[in-house]
Amino acid sequence: MVDFVVDLTDAELVADTLWSLGVVAIEEISNDGNVTLRTSMGENPQDTIASLRDTFPHVEVSTVEIDRAVADTWRDFAEPTHVVNDVYLVPAWKDAPPGSRAIFIEPLDTFGLGNHPTTVLALRLALRCVQPRSTVFDFGSGSGVLSVGAASLLSCTCSAYDIADSAKDALTVNAAENNVTTCNWIPGFPANTVDAVLANILAPVLIAESLNVMQTTQTGGVIILSGMRTEQAAEVLRHYSQCSEITRDELDGWTAVALKKN
């Protein structure tokens, strides 16, 4: 387990950022003027910690040993997450709602269930804007929710990448959970352009990698940007000058935007 000690005024935003990075549970422990956010990040949490510190450099970080059975109690309380219409993201050990089109997700020790607003928004816009049977690159793939969702629901051929070492295993597991054979892992941006890029990652990375994201997308292709707080969207979009906005959606203070590459 990893402890993040933050000022009381920053606790909600830091916790929200941890959710967006894919953690599956957070325990909040109140101290004198501070809050400790305790969460599991698997065996190699360094990349996720580095991403958080890019945005919150003053956060104090430490590791603690917790009994595995205690750490996994969150699984008893996990529930399906509604995305849009009849589409749900469902924990792999739970039953799907009757009549739903379900994407089953096993987060392993590192990633989330896809129930954070950034993932819900990204998948919602992908289902709305990406054409069936497209080629798709999932940038910041985490547990593979977007790749597996696009492959399963839109018959897309997907490649995925995330800086976290365990993301490759998560993609493999969740593709198998959903009988998907058209998702593959690659060690970075693809060599060839694709019809659509799904980028669900923090705003500083969306900005830093904007040229790579645009260069990876075919002319006329779709870019889905998620991981932005609503107040960050304008600054992120300023770096995507080769694109025009198709639509956007908001949920719980987060914004996702669908763009067309001009």
Predicted regions and their residues:
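Conserved SAM/SAH cofactor-binding pocket of Class I
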Residues: 109-190
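Amphipathic, non-transmembrane alpha-helical secondary structure
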Residues: 16, 120-127, 207, 211
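Hydrophobic residues in well-ordered beta-strands that form the structural core
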Residues: 90-91, 160, 225
